[in-house]
Regions:
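General beta-strand structural signal in soluble alpha/beta enzymes
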Residues: 1-2, 18-22, 43-47, 112-114
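Generic structural signal for short, flexible, solvent-exposed coil/loop and linker residues
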Residues: 7, 18, 32, 156-158, ...
Length: 204
Protein backbone atom coordinates (compact mmCIF):
# COMPACT_ATOMS: atom_id res chain seq x y z
CA UNK A 1 0.00 0.00 0.00
CA UNK A 2 2.71 2.49 0.91
CA UNK A 3 4.61 1.95 -2.35
CA UNK A 4 1.63 1.29 -4.62
CA UNK A 5 2.26 4.22 -6.98
CA UNK A 6 5.87 3.19 -7.48
CA UNK A 7 4.87 -0.41 -8.19
CA UNK A 8 2.18 0.66 -10.65
CA UNK A 9 4.66 2.88 -12.53
CA UNK A 10 7.25 0.11 -12.56
CA UNK A 11 4.73 -2.37 -13.94
CA UNK A 12 3.72 0.05 -16.70
CA UNK A 13 7.35 0.64 -17.69
CA UNK A 14 7.86 -3.12 -18.00
CA UNK A 15 4.53 -3.85 -19.73
CA UNK A 16 3.26 -6.11 -16.95
CA UNK A 17 0.26 -6.02 -14.65
CA UNK A 18 0.52 -5.08 -10.98
CA UNK A 19 -2.51 -6.19 -8.98
CA UNK A 20 -3.54 -6.55 -5.38
CA UNK A 21 -3.73 -9.99 -3.73
CA UNK A 22 -7.36 -10.68 -4.52
CA UNK A 23 -8.87 -13.14 -2.11
CA UNK A 24 -8.12 -11.54 1.24
CA UNK A 25 -10.28 -8.90 2.87
CA UNK A 26 -8.38 -5.64 2.15
CA UNK A 27 -8.28 -6.27 -1.58
CA UNK A 28 -11.94 -7.32 -1.65
CA UNK A 29 -12.88 -4.13 0.21
CA UNK A 30 -10.91 -2.13 -2.36
CA UNK A 31 -12.73 -3.94 -5.16
CA UNK A 32 -16.06 -2.83 -3.68
CA UNK A 33 -14.83 0.73 -3.11
CA UNK A 34 -13.60 1.03 -6.69
CA UNK A 35 -16.89 -0.36 -8.03
CA UNK A 36 -18.84 2.23 -6.03
CA UNK A 37 -16.65 5.12 -7.09
CA UNK A 38 -16.71 4.12 -10.75
CA UNK A 39 -20.50 4.12 -10.57
CA UNK A 40 -20.68 7.59 -9.03
CA UNK A 41 -21.40 6.70 -5.40
CA UNK A 42 -19.66 8.26 -2.45
CA UNK A 43 -18.33 5.64 -0.05
CA UNK A 44 -19.51 6.47 3.45
CA UNK A 45 -17.88 3.57 5.26
CA UNK A 46 -15.97 0.44 4.31
CA UNK A 47 -14.57 -2.47 6.22
CA UNK A 48 -14.88 -6.06 7.25
CA UNK A 49 -16.38 -8.33 9.86
CA UNK A 50 -14.54 -10.29 12.52
CA UNK A 51 -15.07 -11.98 15.86
CA UNK A 52 -14.04 -9.34 18.40
CA UNK A 53 -14.59 -8.61 22.08
CA UNK A 54 -12.61 -6.20 24.30
CA UNK A 55 -11.50 -9.11 26.49
CA UNK A 56 -9.75 -10.64 23.48
CA UNK A 57 -7.16 -7.84 23.63
CA UNK A 58 -5.65 -9.70 26.59
CA UNK A 59 -5.44 -12.99 24.71
CA UNK A 60 -2.05 -14.56 24.03
CA UNK A 61 -0.96 -17.44 21.79
CA UNK A 62 -1.18 -19.62 24.92
CA UNK A 63 -4.85 -18.78 25.57
CA UNK A 64 -6.12 -18.21 22.05
CA UNK A 65 -7.76 -21.57 21.31
CA UNK A 66 -10.24 -21.30 24.16
CA UNK A 67 -11.68 -18.19 22.53
CA UNK A 68 -12.21 -20.16 19.33
CA UNK A 69 -13.73 -23.12 21.17
CA UNK A 70 -10.92 -25.39 19.98
CA UNK A 71 -8.45 -27.65 21.72
CA UNK A 72 -4.75 -27.15 21.08
CA UNK A 73 -4.58 -30.58 19.45
CA UNK A 74 -7.51 -29.83 17.13
CA UNK A 75 -6.16 -26.43 16.12
CA UNK A 76 -2.43 -26.98 15.85
CA UNK A 77 -2.02 -30.68 15.08
CA UNK A 78 -5.10 -31.53 13.03
CA UNK A 79 -5.48 -28.21 11.20
CA UNK A 80 -1.96 -26.80 11.37
CA UNK A 81 -3.13 -23.45 12.75
CA UNK A 82 -0.48 -21.04 14.02
CA UNK A 83 -1.40 -19.71 17.51
CA UNK A 84 0.44 -16.40 17.00
CA UNK A 85 -1.33 -15.78 13.71
CA UNK A 86 -4.75 -16.71 15.01
CA UNK A 87 -4.26 -14.61 18.12
CA UNK A 88 -3.63 -11.58 15.89
CA UNK A 89 -7.00 -12.24 14.23
CA UNK A 90 -8.70 -12.22 17.61
CA UNK A 91 -7.04 -9.40 19.56
CA UNK A 92 -7.57 -6.73 16.91
CA UNK A 93 -4.01 -6.43 15.62
CA UNK A 94 -4.70 -7.85 12.17
CA UNK A 95 -7.88 -5.83 11.80
CA UNK A 96 -5.96 -2.63 12.60
CA UNK A 97 -3.24 -3.45 10.05
CA UNK A 98 -5.77 -4.33 7.36
CA UNK A 99 -7.85 -1.20 7.90
CA UNK A 100 -4.68 0.89 7.78
CA UNK A 101 -3.92 -0.70 4.40
CA UNK A 102 -7.44 0.02 3.14
CA UNK A 103 -7.27 3.59 4.44
CA UNK A 104 -3.93 4.19 2.71
CA UNK A 105 -5.13 2.67 -0.56
CA UNK A 106 -8.55 4.36 -0.64
CA UNK A 107 -8.03 7.69 1.15
CA UNK A 108 -10.83 6.77 3.56
CA UNK A 109 -10.14 8.07 7.06
CA UNK A 110 -9.51 6.03 10.17
CA UNK A 111 -11.91 6.47 13.11
CA UNK A 112 -10.86 9.40 15.30
CA UNK A 113 -10.23 7.19 18.36
CA UNK A 114 -9.42 3.92 16.62
CA UNK A 115 -11.55 1.00 15.55
CA UNK A 116 -14.60 0.42 17.75
CA UNK A 117 -15.77 -3.00 16.47
CA UNK A 118 -19.51 -2.40 16.92
CA UNK A 119 -21.65 -5.57 16.75
CA UNK A 120 -23.64 -5.04 13.55
CA UNK A 121 -25.52 -7.58 11.42
CA UNK A 122 -25.67 -7.22 7.66
CA UNK A 123 -29.21 -5.85 7.56
CA UNK A 124 -28.20 -3.04 9.93
CA UNK A 125 -25.01 -1.96 8.16
CA UNK A 126 -26.75 0.81 6.19
CA UNK A 127 -28.50 2.00 9.35
CA UNK A 128 -25.56 2.00 11.74
CA UNK A 129 -22.40 2.60 9.71
CA UNK A 130 -23.37 6.14 8.78
CA UNK A 131 -22.36 9.42 10.47
CA UNK A 132 -23.54 10.06 14.01
CA UNK A 133 -25.45 13.17 12.94
CA UNK A 134 -27.50 10.91 10.65
CA UNK A 135 -28.30 8.50 13.48
CA UNK A 136 -25.37 6.16 12.97
CA UNK A 137 -22.20 5.20 14.80
CA UNK A 138 -19.28 6.51 12.73
CA UNK A 139 -17.41 9.77 13.21
CA UNK A 140 -17.64 11.09 9.68
CA UNK A 141 -18.50 10.21 6.11
CA UNK A 142 -15.69 8.38 4.39
CA UNK A 143 -14.03 6.17 6.99
CA UNK A 144 -13.12 2.55 7.69
CA UNK A 145 -14.53 0.41 10.50
CA UNK A 146 -14.57 -3.26 11.53
CA UNK A 147 -17.77 -4.82 12.82
CA UNK A 148 -17.96 -7.66 15.33
CA UNK A 149 -19.92 -10.87 14.96
CA UNK A 150 -20.55 -11.08 18.71
CA UNK A 151 -22.03 -8.71 21.27
CA UNK A 152 -20.55 -7.58 24.60
CA UNK A 153 -21.93 -10.75 26.21
CA UNK A 154 -19.95 -12.76 23.62
CA UNK A 155 -23.15 -14.03 22.04
CA UNK A 156 -23.41 -14.38 18.27
CA UNK A 157 -25.45 -11.60 16.70
CA UNK A 158 -28.02 -12.41 13.97
CA UNK A 159 -26.85 -12.21 10.35
CA UNK A 160 -23.25 -11.47 11.27
CA UNK A 161 -20.52 -10.70 8.73
CA UNK A 162 -17.69 -12.46 10.55
CA UNK A 163 -15.94 -13.66 7.39
CA UNK A 164 -16.94 -10.94 4.95
CA UNK A 165 -16.51 -7.37 3.78
CA UNK A 166 -18.85 -4.44 3.19
CA UNK A 167 -19.25 -0.89 1.98
CA UNK A 168 -21.89 1.74 2.68
CA UNK A 169 -22.83 4.00 -0.20
CA UNK A 170 -24.82 7.22 -0.35
CA UNK A 171 -27.39 8.28 -2.93
CA UNK A 172 -26.44 11.60 -4.51
CA UNK A 173 -29.95 12.52 -5.61
CA UNK A 174 -33.61 11.53 -5.37
CA UNK A 175 -33.45 9.34 -8.47
CA UNK A 176 -30.78 7.14 -6.87
CA UNK A 177 -32.77 7.00 -3.62
CA UNK A 178 -35.73 5.80 -5.65
CA UNK A 179 -33.54 3.15 -7.28
CA UNK A 180 -32.41 1.91 -3.88
CA UNK A 181 -36.06 1.40 -3.00
CA UNK A 182 -37.22 0.10 -6.38
CA UNK A 183 -34.50 -2.55 -6.52
CA UNK A 184 -35.08 -3.73 -2.96
CA UNK A 185 -31.79 -2.56 -1.50
CA UNK A 186 -31.40 -2.42 2.26
CA UNK A 187 -31.30 1.21 3.39
CA UNK A 188 -31.37 3.39 6.47
CA UNK A 189 -34.67 5.02 7.48
CA UNK A 190 -34.04 8.03 5.22
CA UNK A 191 -33.44 5.84 2.17
CA UNK A 192 -30.21 7.73 1.44
CA UNK A 193 -27.72 5.08 2.52
CA UNK A 194 -27.40 1.51 1.34
CA UNK A 195 -24.93 -1.29 1.93
CA UNK A 196 -23.29 -3.91 -0.21
CA UNK A 197 -21.53 -6.85 1.38
CA UNK A 198 -19.78 -10.06 0.51
CA UNK A 199 -20.25 -12.83 3.09
CA UNK A 200 -16.96 -14.70 2.70
CA UNK A 201 -13.34 -14.26 1.73
CA UNK A 202 -10.38 -16.52 1.05
CA UNK A 203 -6.77 -15.87 1.88
CA UNK A 204 -4.94 -14.23 -0.99
Amino acid sequence: VTCGKYLADLAKENNVICSMAYGDQPSLIMEQIEWAQLNGFSVVCAGKGTKYHPDFEYSTPDTVWGHYGLSKERAEIESGMNPKMFNSFLCGDKSAIEMCAVSNASNLKCPSNGLTFPPVGVYDIAKKLIPKEEGGLIDYEGQVEVISSIDLNQKDIPNDLRWGVYIVIKAQNQYVKNCFKDYGMVTDVSGSYSAIWRPYHYIG
